[in-house]
């Protein structure tokens, strides 16, 4: 990513976080993990993490898709003096934290498992 797209992505991540926190209070807890912007700044891919059951997470994603135009409008009001055109928003669910937590659980199980010395091969 170029320096420009990185700066734009960082700004969008900050502003979207503020929008979710201040202007969309009914939206459940959503963490913006990352924002990736295309080179032409036409599309912003917003990767989010949510807490809850898979059904709740699906409902949150559906809610964000329904509110997409409204969120973009709020974003436009906040950054319109910095951009000629506000990027289209695409929301994606990020499962990185869930995978990391699962790996941690597996590692803790391995650490707790008793080691049978009779079965370990000697070199």
UniProtKB/Swiss-Prot annotation:
Q: What is its main location?
A: cytoplasm
Looking up InterPro entries in the UniProt record yields: KH_dom-like_a/b, RbfA, RbfA_dom_sf
Q: Which UniProt keywords apply?
A: Cytoplasm, Ribosome biogenesis
- Pfam families annotated for this entry? RBFA (PF02033)
Q: Which GO terms describe its biological process?
A: maturation of SSU-rRNA
Localization, UniProt: Cytoplasm
A GO molecular function held by the record: ribosomal small subunit binding
Q: Which GO terms describe its cellular component?
A: cytosol
Per its UniProt entry, which superkingdom is the organism in? Answer: Bacteria
PANTHER family the UniProt entry points to: RIBOSOME-BINDING FACTOR A, CHLOROPLASTIC-RELATED
**Main function:** One of several proteins that assist in the late maturation steps of the functional core of the 30S ribosomal subunit. Associates with free 30S ribosomal subunits (but not with 30S subunits that are part of 70S ribosomes or polysomes). Required for efficient processing of 16S rRNA. May interact with the 5'-terminal helix region of 16S rRNA.
Instruction: Please report which protein family the annotation says this sequence is part of.
Output: Belongs to the RbfA family.
Subunit field text:
Monomer. Binds 30S ribosomal subunits, but not 50S ribosomal subunits or 70S ribosomes.
Quote the protein name from its UniProt record.
Ribosome-binding factor A
Organism in which the protein naturally occurs: Chlorobium chlorochromatii (strain CaD3)
